Amino acid sequence: MTAEEVDKESDPAIEDVKSDYDAIELGNENENENEVVSLDSMKAVISRASSELKHENDQGEERDLGSVEKDPILERYHAACKQGDMKTLREMVESKVIDLSNDYDPKERVSGLHWACINNRLSAVKYLAGAGAEVNFKGGELDATPLHWASKSGLVYIVDELLKAGADPNITDSQGYNLLHTSVFSSNIMLVIYVLFFVVDGKEDVDQPDPHQRTALQWATYQADALTVENLLKFNADVKNADDAGFTALHWGTVKGSIPVMDLLIKHGSDFFQTTNDGKNCFTIGKELYSIGSLEASLYKNGFDKNGFPLPQYFSASTGKMLTFFLPWVLIPLVFYIFSKITFFIALLINTIVLVISGLVLSRLVVPSYLLSKRHPILNSPLLAGILSGTIAIAFFIWFTKISILTFTEKPVGNIIMLGFFIGLITLFIGLMKSDPGYIPGTVDHDKVRETIKELLSLGKFDAKHFCVHTWIRIPLRSKYDRDSACLISAFDHFCPWVYNQIGLLNHKLFYMFVVLLEISVWWFLPLMMEYFDELEDYLENRKGKHFGDCHFLGDEDLCFGLHHDTFNFLLLCWVIFQAFWVLCLIAVQTVQMLKGVTDYEFVQINKKLKSNGTTTEDIFSSTPPELMSEELIAELDAPALDPRQVPQRTCFTVCCTLLGLDKLVTMIKSVLRLKSDEPSSRSSHLSALARIPTDYGWKQNLKDFWLLPDTSSPLWRRILLPPKDSHALLNGMEVDYYTLYTLPNATEELV
């Protein structure tokens, strides 16, 4: 990379703004020459940006024409700085071959420290700064310091070292950009967070503008960088600041059409009716740039209609959730009743109408009272939990009012046990819905955050894999961030819509006990229902004088009798058995994962890496210098990017499979077969390392870790049956704190 190329990266939005403008003008010309959209509010920005860009290009051409051959000694020195060749660097500096106060070409004015910084050569930067290189030297066409060069490339470790060496973060380049601006240009959230905590916090103004009155927040919104926007807003960046064209952050967000960014800005009070200098609000800009759909979606998520007015709210959030939860308690018996009383096809038509109307009422009137999202609203509502609980409640009601009365004489023990099962199911279900899955509290103590950042920098692990950019804490092993609760969840397993809760460290044992008890209860309920049909037939024949002929349509006389003479309970039995099949799939997956010592989330991630040959779509924002990189990080960064075309698209069928757990069952079977295969693997060594399960300590130890509490003074039955009360649990037989779990017990290498 030449100095010219580095400098031309100075204003990342110049070409993008120009492209946006050209595209909209071209589109309007093609549609109707008389209806050219006016974007006067942006022309000033574009004109200025274009002239700056033209000026840079003209300068570059003039320099190329007038360039002379460079000093070979200086060339060798700069090459050593770029490559981090410490031996050559020391020889040239200590032998006085290179004068650090004059180590640049007079035409380029780019020092060796500049080159070491932009190439992420931490050792070279430390050496040069310690040897007396000027850390605030302004070089290149834009009079940028090494700090500017490093920050534009998102190099956190280099920025940290330069600041330690006395670099001034308040210096601006010739375009008027300070350290915060250039850090935002990099779109590296780790650098932005570092600058916010070590430079801005309590010292500088987070809204310090550039010469065109654009703040860091406005640049971040134009770049559609939701993570940077989120963190700037946490530092109280002003959403209402306008640049010299009258554009606020939301105006720039509308230009790019990023829903997450606009969502954040609207949540923090952005005025979508505020106009630019030529009188255009966000709605006008959205229509001109075809981003109006994204703006309307962002407004909807914040409770506004497409015109920016508050949506009508018919219920409070708690009432809406209650209605959603209890609706299946009414619909399930109603559907069964209609099928049991009316001819099948007419009943099917009526039930379809009932369900469609109920769905429309639910989605239009009820769900928006607590959930303003058009993406999988059913999965994120308590509806499925209502279906499961409603099924249990109806089954209990039928058992208590009909089955137990007719069958208690013949099966007293079975009915008493069934009562115990119902009590256990209801208790566990309520407990699961209200349980804490293991939320790890974040922090707002800036001193603690700075300590965490310093620690991770010293370990070479300050990236999004080890530091949570949302909660500002170090990420423990086996945890995952949950957007709904805005917390990390320890030993995260999965989100279960059937209990309307996340499953993690503190409730995973309860969840497994619940699904196993649910499966046992279904198969215990089946013979009681069969006995009920038999007793009902005898009762009607003996007491009512009715006679029923033989029926073998279903291969069982009792079932056939239930179909024809107690259709409601027959349909209930079929519905309950259907539930048992998907629960059985879930138990199978959970059991295998328990034996392997892995959570569902970890299991899915392992198999994604296996399926994609180690590729990943996740950006961990790592700028770790080569000398601090671990083998694991090198392998992860070297893996090729995943082709988006290889990512399976979600369809209605895949969503249904997800709800029933069938996708997990198929994945588990394929993964077990792959892991058990004796065929030679064609994968590289780093990929085979990704495929291993680091928490698999053998099935016996894995079972002990899952079921036993670490408190050895408690009775064994309490250790087995009770869930953890805090973050302490067993791992490889050792007590660990999952809130601060950064290494695995007896692990041969540090994984976090």
Swiss-Prot record:
GO terms for molecular function: protein-cysteine S-palmitoyltransferase activity. Residues 1-318, 363-380, 434-509, 589-752 are cytoplasmic. InterPro entries: Ankyrin_rpt, Ankyrin_rpt-contain_sf, Palmitoyltrfase_DHHC. Palmitoyltransferase specific for casein kinase 1. Keywords: Acyltransferase, ANK repeat, Endosome, Golgi apparatus, Lipoprotein, Membrane, Palmitate, Repeat, Transferase, Transmembrane, Transmembrane helix. It is a multi-pass membrane protein. Residues 340-341, 402-412, 531-567 are lumenal. Residues 466-516 form the DHHC domain. Gene3D superfamilies: Ankyrin repeat-containing domain. This is Palmitoyltransferase AKR1. ANK repeats lie at residues 72-102, 108-137, 142-171, 175-208, 212-241, 245-274. Belongs to the DHHC palmitoyltransferase family. AKR/ZDHHC17 subfamily. One of its GO terms (cellular component) is early endosome membrane. The chain crosses the membrane at residues 319-339, 342-362, 381-401, 413-433, 510-530, 568-588. Its EC number is 2.3.1.225. The active site is at C496. It holds the Pfam family Ank_2. It catalyses: L-cysteinyl-[protein] + hexadecanoyl-CoA = S-hexadecanoyl-L-cysteinyl-[protein] + CoA. The gene is AKR1. It comes from Kluyveromyces lactis (strain ATCC 8585 / CBS 2359 / DSM 70799 / NBRC 1267 / NRRL Y-1140 / WM37). It comes from the Eukaryota. The keyword Transmembrane applies.
